[in-house]
Amino acid sequence: MAAAQPRLPAGAAMVRRLARGCWSAFWDYETPKVIVVRNRRLGFVHRMVQLLILLYFVWYVFIVQKSYQDSETGPESSIITKVKGITMSEHKVWDVEEYVKPPEGGSVVSIITRIEVTPSQTLGTCPESMRVHSSTCHLDDDCVAGQLDMQGNGIRTGRCVPYYHGDSKTCEVSAWCPVEDGTSENHFLGKMAPNFTILIKNSIHYPKFKFSKGNIASQKSDYLKHCTFDQDSDPYCPIFRLGFIVEQAGENFTELAHKGGVIGVIINWNCDLDLSESECNPKYSFRRLDPKYDPASSGYNFRFAKYYKINGTTTTRTLIKAYGIRIDVIVHGQAGKFSLIPTIINLATALTSIGVGSFLCDWILLTFMNKNKLYSHKKFDKVRTPRHPSSRWPVTLALVLGQIPPPPSHYSQDQPPSLPSGEGPALGEGAELPLAVQPPRSCSSSALTEQVVDTLDQHMGQRPPVPEPSQQDSTSTDPKGLAQL
């Protein structure tokens, strides 16, 4: 005898059974089974969910979001700015060349509204500013010669000298003297600044749709000389008063001019290219970009200097710390045009999403309904095709679904064999042959239904009234596996 194979441990056997079951289930085919449940509450929930999904796709997806269009964001853009106006301080008139930085104009332009001037600076030695950390001193030993403070104005000489005013002392530095804050002068330029005008020329291009447009109307050449922007009357005259921009951003002009700030001019080009070109118009909005209530980062200022020589030898400069209103022009937008591909994709998504209602109602049906076990039994069937069906018995869907027992392929002990000819009682008119010896019937729907019903009744031990073939509806038994509740 062959040696017995060693038995696998219980864990290994369980893993093998699990793997075998997973492998077998992997090749199963699942198909939906239609069940009609006559329950108005469940039907109401189903239709309401479908209606909400349909409204969402029709109103929001297709009307609001215009998902039937192919879109392009981030248009190619060019910006040119030009500022005009004059102002004056206590003793000086300021024109555009002095208070606008940079002078060439672009997407960013700064308009100076207040300055701190340190005039006549020359290279030499002088007291360090008291604003510099650890610049105050009492003795020369408090100042280290050659020390360089990156937040300061120069290199320390090692001497402790009196400050520009008062009794305090600071370390002496080698720098442009006098240093800032020592002898600075303040000048306010914002008195007439609200009346400054800013021309913003903008043109955009959507390369996907080969569409271009600008924010200036094609009118007479002198049109821009006599107009200012108005959303209703002159939307294509992009000349803005500085006071109007600050007001639209919700800021106080005097406060903003004193401390400085950053204002964004946002131009939005949202264009529906299915409409005419005249419907594609720029929309302007204004808001402050720097944090207003953060003392460490609010405001806007920068420094620059003007250099000149005295007697052709000594180089001097005037240092200017400028506070101003910086204008940032920001352009964005989106263009859309009808396209067949996104339309088909979104329609398919909408039709698929309607099935969510059926999934939700199936979950309610199998979880919360009173007859959930009955519904679960009717909804799920496990089907196995017979390996060796009898050649004399037609394989029907009712047989495969298990609604009738399979026919015996051989006579068993429980079934009597067919009587040989000449033996047994004679079969008169109207007598019925045993099941095993009945001649095969034609595969019509009525005959198949009678066969399924008779076999089911024999299997269940009941005998319903025999229906008349010409009068009865053959759909009382469902050979297609469809259950109706």
UniProtKB/Swiss-Prot annotation:
Region of interest (Disordered), residue spans: 406-485
Catalyzed reactions per annotation: Ca(2+)(in) = Ca(2+)(out); K(+)(in) = K(+)(out); Na(+)(in) = Na(+)(out)
Glycosylation sites: N195, N252, N311
Sequence ranges on the Cytoplasmic membrane side: 1-43, 361-485
Extracellular side: 65-339
Keywords carried by this UniProt record: ATP-binding, Cell membrane, Disulfide bond, Glycoprotein, Hearing, Ion channel, Ion transport, Ligand-gated ion channel, Membrane, Nucleotide-binding, Transmembrane, Transmembrane helix, Transport
Membrane topology annotation: Multi-pass membrane protein
Annotated spans, Pore-forming motif: 322-335
One Gene Ontology biological process: response to hypoxia
Transmembrane feature ranges: 44-64, 340-360
Role summary: ATP-gated nonselective transmembrane cation channel permeable to potassium, sodium and calcium. Activation by extracellular ATP induces a variety of cellular responses, such as excitatory postsynaptic responses in sensory neurons, neuromuscular junctions (NMJ) formation, hearing, perception of taste and peristalsis. In the inner ear, regulates sound transduction and auditory neurotransmission, outer hair cell electromotility, inner ear gap junctions, and K(+) recycling. Mediates synaptic transmission between neurons and from neurons to smooth muscle.
Residues that coordinate or bind ATP: K82, K84, T197, S297, N301, R303, K321
Effect of disrupting the coding gene: Mice show small differences in body weight, but are visibly and histopathologically normal for up to 1 year of age. Simultaneous knockout of P2rx2 and P2rx3 results in reduced pain-related behaviors in response to intraplantar injection of formalin and reduced urinary bladder reflexes and decreased pelvic afferent nerve activity in response to bladder distension. Neurons have minimal to no response to ATP. P2rx2 null mice show impaired peristalsis in ileal segments of small intestine.
Places the protein is found: Cell membrane
One of the record's GO molecular function terms: ATP binding
Family from the record: Belongs to the P2X receptor family.
Keyword hit for Glycoprotein: yes
Intrachain S-S bonds: C22-C443, C126-C177, C137-C160, C143-C171, C227-C237, C271-C280
Keyword Nucleus attributed: no
Species classification: Eukaryota, Metazoa, Chordata, Craniata, Vertebrata
UniProt biased composition (Polar residues): 469-478
Subunit-level organization: Homotrimer and heterotrimer; functional P2XRs are organized as homomeric and heteromeric trimers. Homotrimer. Forms heterotrimer with P2XR1. Forms heterotrimer with P2XR3. Forms heterotrimer with P2XR6.
Species this chain originates from: Mus musculus (Mouse)
Protein name (database record): P2X purinoceptor 2
Biased composition regions of type Low complexity, renumbered to the chain: 420-436
